Amino acid sequence: MGPGGRVARLLAPLMWRRAVSSVAGSAVGAEPGLRLLAVQRLPVGAAFCRACQTPNFVRGLHSEPGLEERAEGTVNEGRPESDAADHTGPKFDIDMMVSLLRQENARDICVIQVPPEMRYTDYFVIVSGTSTRHLHAMAFYVVKMYKHLKCKRDPHVKIEGKDTDDWLCVDFGSMVIHLMLPETREIYELEKLWTLRSYDDQLAQIAPETVPEDFILGIEDDTSSVTPVELKCE
């Protein structure tokens, strides 16, 4: 090997290292901009709904066939998270939940604020769907949005009733949502259970009123046994 070949062999690793460093530097410089676009604050109202309806965003939320139970979905794979990103993006709260349910055409949305002394959850949400497919679609969409917007400290999602046809329960920690068919919702009446509570039990425990056996209701056909009463007008 001549002198030219030896020089080329010595310079090749240096040139390769410099090329890799420049590519990595450009990628790191572009990362804050991409992260800022991902976590920019959006209003919960109509503007947020329009942002959610963009093709890329909707495709990412509705591309998978079923519900997931793990907290980190495929949306967040490979994406670095930071404490700053956890606090600058839109917050997944009760207003966001109601907006998402309305966007998915949920019916008869009922939000109940649970007293703190119960130590169960902050909000209890009950909604109705038109079919089993509608219930699962609403639950899947809300869960995907939660995973996309959640912070590191937020709890994992718990889903109950994935194999049922008429009732789904999704526990987000601070919010618990029940998605039910109208007939199932009418049977269990969760609204009364969580609003009336003990008062509803008291009403059920009241004994029915009965009338005495000698109580006469109506006019008898045989009036012979009725003693006439003389009325005096003054």
Swiss-Prot record:
Please report the organism this UniProt entry assigns to the protein.
Homo sapiens
InterPro entries noted in UniProt: Iojap/RsfS/C7orf30 (IPR004394), NT_sf (IPR043519)
Please classify the protein's predominant subcellular localization into one broad category: mitochondrion
Gene name for this UniProt entry:
MALSU1
Q: Which family does it belong to?
A: Belongs to the Iojap/RsfS family.
- Show the Gene3D superfamilies listed in the entry: Beta Polymerase, domain 2 (3.30.460.10)
The protein's name: Mitochondrial assembly of ribosomal large subunit protein 1
**Quick check: keyword Cytoplasm in the entry?**
no
| One GO biological process term | negative regulation of ribosome biogenesis
Coiled-coil regions listed in the entry: none
Q: How does it assemble?
A: Associates with the mitochondrial ribosome large subunit (39S) via interaction with MRPL12 and/or MRPL14. The interaction generates steric hindrance that is expected to prevent premature association of the 28S and 39S ribosomal subunits. Interacts with intermediates of the mitochondrial ribosome large subunit (mt-LSU) (recruits the mitochondrial ribosome and complex I assembly factor AltMIEF1 and NDUFAB1); regulates mitochondrial ribosomes assembly. Interacts with MRPL12 and MRPL14.
Q: Where in the cell is it found?
A: Mitochondrion matrix
Listed GO molecular functions?
Answer: mitochondrial large ribosomal subunit binding; ribosomal large subunit binding
What cellular component terms from Gene Ontology apply here?
cytosol; mitochondrial matrix; mitochondrion
Stretch list, region Disordered: 63-88
Pfam families named in the record: RsfS
> What's this chain's function?
Required for normal mitochondrial ribosome function and mitochondrial translation. May play a role in ribosome biogenesis by preventing premature association of the 28S and 39S ribosomal subunits. Interacts with mitochondrial ribosomal protein uL14m (MRPL14), probably blocking formation of intersubunit bridge B8, preventing association of the 28S and 39S ribosomal subunits. Addition to isolated mitochondrial ribosomal subunits partially inhibits translation, probably by interfering with the association of the 28S and 39S ribosomal subunits and the formation of functional ribosomes.
Q: What keywords tag this UniProt record?
A: Mitochondrion, Ribosome biogenesis
